[in-house]
């Protein structure tokens, strides 16, 4: 997994792994959740990948749009 930069210093996300049709997110609690095109939708997954690369906004996005859409 790639380290999440956490530019805002308040994120609950610590790392992520992006694949062609999914993103796996590790939270500071140690829990890992996978979000796929199938369950969360391609638009959400692609936006999450962009936020992960940016290092900002991923935790907020998850809480707002895809909190329970993990595999």
Which residue ranges define each predicted feature?
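A charge-rich, low-complexity, intrinsically flexible signal that marks solvent-exposed coils, linkers
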Residues: 1-71
């Amino acid at each position: 997994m790639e380290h999440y930069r956490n530019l805002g210093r308040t994120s609950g996300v610590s790392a992520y792994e992006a694949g062609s049709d999914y993103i796996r997110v590790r939270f500071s609690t140690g829990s890992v959740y996978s979000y796929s095109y199938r369950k969360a939708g391609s638009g959400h997954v692609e936006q999450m990948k962009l936020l992960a690369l940016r290092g900002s906004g991923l935790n907020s996005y998850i809480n707002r749009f895809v909190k329970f859409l993990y595999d």
